[in-house]
């Protein structure tokens, strides 16, 4: 084996002092730096996820809130104006009470004023439920509440079968089944 030349490129003989190993990297500084980078990455990812969630959930939350307010407004409006209009009440069927009446077999007294029916008094027969009242009594009642004082059925001017009534309305006709008096 040929002799090895221990001279460096500079041409100087190698030093006789032992060479130092390369310096160790500062692991403490490196680990602190990596921990900082990882924490920043996790925080940034958390912010991105919060942003995505808010973009997806916020519209749902706002629409739900809008529906809730609209429902409350509608309920408040119904509570404040639960009575019928005077125009509507005037269209309800009326008749003059006569003693041999078909209505006397159902009620002998008006349940609004607790007074009996007398000959010649104007009365109303509510369509739908068929209950009979003094005209003045039931008119006052219906201006405040849109239901029958006895059975609480909603007062409607026209009796309709819900499906059949829709069919007649489609053809532009109003099918009346008012009671013949």
Swiss-Prot record:
Zinc finger feature spans (RING-type): 110-152
Alphabetical list of PROSITE patterns matching this protein: ZF_RING_2
GO cellular component term of the entry, any: membrane
Gene Ontology terms: biological process: cellular response to hypoxia; protein ubiquitination
Organism: Arabidopsis thaliana
Domain notes: The RING-type zinc finger domain mediates binding to an E2 ubiquitin-conjugating enzyme.
Keywords noted in UniProt: Membrane, Metal-binding, Transferase, Transmembrane, Transmembrane helix, Ubl conjugation pathway, Zinc, Zinc-finger
Subcellular localization(s) per the UniProt record: Membrane
Class in the EC hierarchy, top level: transferase
TM region(s), chain numbering: 32-52
Signal peptide: none
Bilayer topology annotation: Single-pass membrane protein
InterPro entries: Znf_RING, Znf_RING/FYVE/PHD
UniProt EC number: 2.3.2.27
The protein's name: RING-H2 finger protein ATL56
């Amino acid at each position: 084996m040929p002799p090895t030349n221990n001279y460096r490129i500079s041409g100087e003989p190698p030093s006789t002092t032992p060479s130092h190993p390369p310096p160790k990297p500062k692991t403490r500084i490196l680990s602190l730096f990596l921990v900082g980078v990882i924490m920043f990455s996790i925080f940034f990812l958390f912010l991105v996820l919060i942003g995505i969630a808010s973009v997806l959930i916020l519209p749902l939350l706002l629409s739900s809130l809008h529906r809730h307010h609209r429902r409350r407004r509608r309920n408040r409006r119904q509570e404040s104006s639960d009575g019928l209009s005077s125009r509507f009440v005037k269209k309800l069927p009326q008749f003059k009470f006569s003693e041999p009446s078909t209505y006397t077999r159902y009620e002998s007294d008006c349940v609004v004023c607790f007074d009996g029916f007398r000959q010649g008094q104007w009365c109303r027969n509510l369509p739908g439920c068929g209950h009979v009242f003094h005209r003045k009594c039931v008119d006052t009642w219906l201006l405040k509440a849109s239901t029958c004082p006895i059975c609480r059925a909603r007062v409607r001017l026209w009796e309709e079968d819900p499906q059949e009534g829709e069919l007649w309305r489609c053809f532009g006709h109003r099918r009346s089944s008012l009671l013949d008096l």
